[in-house]
Amino acid sequence: MKALHFGAGNIGRGFIGKLLADAGAQLTFADVNQPLLDELNKRKSYQVNVVGEQARVEEVKNVSAVNSGSPEVVELIAQADMVTTAVGPQILARIAGTVAQGLVTRHQQGNTRPLNIIACENMVRGTSQLKQQVFAALPESEQAWVEQHVGFVDSAVDRIVPPSEAGSTDILAVTVETFSEWIVDGTQFKGQPPQIAGMELTDNLMAFVERKLFTLNTGHAITAYLGQLAGHQTIRDAILDPAVRQTVKGAMEESGAVLIKRYAFDPLKHAAYIEKILSRFENPYLHDDVERVGRQPLRKLSAGDRLIKPLLGTLEYQLPHNNLVTGIAAAMSYRSEQDPQAQELVELLAKLGPKATLAQISGLPADSEVVEQAVSVYNAMQDKLAH
């Protein structure tokens, strides 16, 4: 199996790329970080530190790398059996043109073997969004052929992969937690789905996408935002603070009540899933900084993301949401000199005030009860910081 993976960052190397290589794929990474690409091509392998109760080092072998902007990428798409991405939602749109070129070349070469493309991003139905962007870049005459021979497979991915430790001398080494989950929509493949250990097929992907978004992502973000307010440096320090933990767990239970109602999840199993996630946040081997996890607050406060989407579910089913609201207020309080969205958030708050800012970012009606509630919690947080 020939596989091309866009994004040779920590998630690409430590999660998706690793599973593909472990499955025996002939794997090429595409990225723009030239020193990283040179090192991958020189060594053809790298090390993954899997940390948890039993830490171990696993070697990923037989890999190569190309620059995402090079003609080689187009040729690789024309020949691949599988294309995956872990580039972040913002960059996904930028690779659509390259993917479209590769598909046109594939058609010209008469390659009718099925190709499956899977975007492994923190977004809902990311591959379907990529497909729209690819089709916008395709000549109309090519679209029917692509529709027939290329599967765009949506997925849900979950593995905590913090940035490399400062002072680490090996630019290829990556640290990951033991837990990983890669769930793909089995109904969207062209041809037989490939056998890859660690990739699970489902015919009910949205349940898994929302379970992960409403639990792991919601919990992780709120831990970061409340952790920063309480003066904690890492996710572990924050989640071990009883006050933070109580709100985070409460928020995950509130979003969980939406999932139980919407997808008929087993309440006991979902409670166990929440406990599992809390224990992952406590992992002493993952030094995950609250400022990093809180990055991009405008995106995280948007209507389809980890804070507002579960809140909208509680409104739809008339369920409690006090802890989610506290999390939203904490997100509005996030500050970072390094993050452009944090800077923009501060400017919006100064210009519009909290009520209009939250309404603008989230799409919630400014005069709604829930916005009033979030603003009141936010103001109380700001008063506390001022004293």
Curated annotation (Swiss-Prot):
Membrane-crossing ranges are none
Positions bound to NAD(+): A3, L4, H5, F6, G7, A8, G9, N10, I11, G12, R13, G14
GO cellular-component term (any): cytosol
Q: What is its EC number?
A: 1.1.1.17
Q: Name one GO molecular function term.
A: mannitol-1-phosphate 5-dehydrogenase activity
What residue range is the signal peptide?
Answer: none
Keyword set for this entry?
A: NAD, Oxidoreductase
Main EC class of this protein?
oxidoreductase
Highest taxon of source:
Bacteria
What family does this chain come from, according to its entry? Answer: Belongs to the mannitol dehydrogenase family.
Q: What is this protein called?
A: Mannitol-1-phosphate 5-dehydrogenase
Q: Which organism is it from?
A: Yersinia enterocolitica serotype O:8 / biotype 1B (strain NCTC 13174 / 8081)
Q: State which gene encodes it.
A: mtlD
